[in-house]
Amino acid sequence: MSKPSDHIKRPMNAFMVWSRGQRRKMAQENPKMHNSEISKRLGAEWKLLSEAEKRPYIDEAKRLRAQHMKEHPDYKYRPRRKPKNLLKKDRYVFPLPYLGDTDPLKAAGLPVGASDGLLSAPEKARAFLPPASAPYSLLDPAQFSSSAIQKMGEVPHTLATSALPYASTLGYQNGAFGSLSCPSQHTHTHPSPTNPGYVVPCNCTAWSASTLQPPVAYILFPGMTKTGIDPYSSAHATAM
């Protein structure tokens, strides 16, 4: 890289005058020594010199400075340092703070690859879910079997709508779920006739074990009537 012809060098100071001969001598004695290492050693040796030893070099530096001022009266020292790249300094204008791992599996301290095993085994993944308030999903029609409805009737009447995960989103009111079967209120729910996936409350009397009887099949032979078999028919005939 060629230097500009109008560039004016600075006048040497006392250390530069002294080190000019010392640098050449040290480079000849240590040809493999780097220039930066030579400068460090020369600086340490210059500090060890006394004022009497430095005086000749200080006087020589003053003479060179006076001569430099005569030759270049308008000289002003302007360092040719390259400006620092502001883009490198402010590369990230809006630094983002570290928020930690957002993966709940990593936060739980699971080893790498454990998430794949949990996806393939739903039973293992279910252990990390919070316990649900409702034992059955309100969106699965297959859950509404006779045993499921019977278990839903055993839910205490203190169950609030906020305890059910889908009650607010499906539009259920407190009264709908607050009227689940309770021994003191004698109310229960029935599956919806139009949509099996929903249950509707009713205020009819509670079912008892005596009233829940299976249907009876009747076989009538020639010459026989249903009067002697059906108690309701006999009672109706007596009233007539």
UniProtKB/Swiss-Prot annotation:
Residues 8-76 bind DNA. It holds the Pfam family HMG_box. It comes from the Eukaryota. Highly expressed in developing brain and spinal cord. InterPro entries: HMG_box_dom (IPR009071), HMG_box_dom_sf (IPR036910), SOX_fam (IPR022097), SRY-related_HMG-box_TF-like (IPR050140). GO terms for molecular function: chromatin binding; DNA-binding transcription factor activity, RNA polymerase II-specific; sequence-specific DNA binding; sequence-specific double-stranded DNA binding. GO terms for biological process: entrainment of circadian clock; negative regulation of DNA-templated transcription; negative regulation of transcription by RNA polymerase II; regulation of neuron migration; visual perception. Keywords: DNA-binding, Nucleus, Repressor, Transcription, Transcription regulation. GO terms for cellular component: nucleus; transcription regulator complex. It is found in: Nucleus. Acts as a negative regulator of transcription. This is Transcription factor SOX-14. The gene is Sox14.
